[in-house]
Amino acid sequence: MAREKEIEIQTRLGKQRILPSKVIYFPRGIMGFENQHEFTLLKLREDAPFLVLQSIDDARLGLLVADPYSFLSDYQIKVSDAEQKLLRLRNIRQVAVLVTVSIPPGQPDKTALNLSGPILVNHEAKLGLQVPQVEGKYPAQVYVHPQNETKVAAADARHPDDGGAENW
């Protein structure tokens, strides 16, 4: 079997080498970056709860993301039939759910998860899609630190499908 040749991409964190099989195609791009279609997930550290959804073509475009179920065990999203078809979903185990994370400069205690725009990744088909949640039972943002306004579930809660981002 031939070994896959790594590609080198530029990021704000410096040069990164990734396998082409780790490239995720977003047919609609990401909100605000609709012209960017190819991304990959980069680990910041092995023990960190966050990943970077990094554009392959734009070194400046890297979004901090996290598995929402690590913080909020009962998080639920609605995915339309059309969105499932676009993602080529046959089974819920094919998908990882991610949300963007915001950390205000100098205020890590105000780290928040954006629950209104989850990002779904079919890790088998290497397809991604941001799925806005218009009518959800959750606020747009949830703080990850319990001392803030919204209390969240314990950090050791896990997504029930075991198909999370750790597969990357």
Swiss-Prot record:
UniProt-annotated location(s): Cytoplasm
Task: List, alphabetically, the GO terms of the cellular component aspect.
Answer: cytoplasm
Give the source species: Oleidesulfovibrio alaskensis (strain ATCC BAA-1058 / DSM 17464 / G20) (Desulfovibrio alaskensis)
What InterPro entries does the database record attribute to this sequence?
Flagellar_assembly_factor_FliW, Flagellar_assmbl_FliW_dom_sf
| Gene Ontology biological process terms from the UniProt entry | bacterial-type flagellum assembly; regulation of translation
Top-rank lineage group of the source organism: Bacteria
Family as reported in the entry's similarity comment: Belongs to the FliW family.
Q: How does it assemble?
A: Interacts with translational regulator CsrA and flagellin(s).
Q: What is its main location?
A: cytoplasm
Instruction: Give the residues annotated as coiled coil.
Output: none
> Can you say what this protein is called?
Flagellar assembly factor FliW
Q: Which UniProt keywords apply?
A: Bacterial flagellum biogenesis, Chaperone, Cytoplasm, Translation regulation
Q: Does the keyword Chaperone apply?
A: yes
Keyword hit for Cytoplasm: yes
Functional summary from the UniProt entry: Acts as an anti-CsrA protein, binds CsrA and prevents it from repressing translation of its target genes, one of which is flagellin. Binds to flagellin and participates in the assembly of the flagellum.
Designated gene of the protein = fliW
HAMAP family the UniProt entry points to = FliW
**Residues in the signal sequence:** none
